[in-house]
């Protein structure tokens, strides 16, 4: 995990120096081989999240300037979403293929954490097999293309800040890879995050135009939010994000595959439902992660 963050910070600094703390070293303690460390430049945290105009301009600059070393989507090493392993140590020509694999991995981790919820699992299959190809394959077909951009991988309020000394925005706690730039914004959809303020998305779009087809930007954003919200469901016991993901999957299936959705719908109870944690509690526990 430490090596993944070290390589993420190294990649971010390679594109935009000072947009992330410079990494110095990582390793394990001789006296405790199961304990690892990461040594980076110290940056004093100020306002969180940073000013939307400055921050989104720098983020868009990162996405525009970054160049995948293979021209493909992926990364040269596995990185992590908090403490959850991501499928990043591969290279794919198709963004749809990589995102499908990444979301499928998060679904498997959710099953391991909470147990299989049959109704939810059926929705997951429909999203993986139908919705993802429908929404993401058009990005790279009929003459359209998207560039593999270096993404931070987990941009929420507490992983962004204004540097007290310079007044400039910076990011940290990265789990990077080369993906669709719009994936980065999927984490801003959740109302529990201050980055969900429309100023951030609006200013980002001014710096990095929407991918074609533009009229499906919001649908893609909802699709990308699923992976982040599933991560929250796994990391924070008792939160309501599993239910939120189910509802958002249902919305996507209703919009694009209504007949298939009706064919699989049924009343299947969710095992161990604990969905009464507040947004404040979620933020506190995310911060601990």
Place the predicted regions along the sequence by residue:
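Hydrophobic packing residues in well-ordered alpha-helices of helical domains and bundles
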Residues: 2, 52-55, 120-124, 242-245
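An alpha-helical support segment within catalytic cores of ATP-dependent transferases
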Residues: 28-31, 67-152, 163-166, 274
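Anionic ligand-binding catalytic core segments
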Residues: 113-116, 196-198, 213, 274-277
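ATP/Mg2+ or Mg2+-diphosphate-binding catalytic cores
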Residues: 232-289
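Residue-level detector of conserved, well-ordered beta-strand and adjacent loop positions
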Residues: 41, 172, 246
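Active-site Asp-x-Gly
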Residues: 95-100, 104, 108-109, 145-150, ...
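A general structural signal marking secondary-structure boundaries and capping sites
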Residues: 13-16, 63-72, 110, 135, ...
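ATP-binding pocket architecture of kinase catalytic cores
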Residues: 1-97, 101
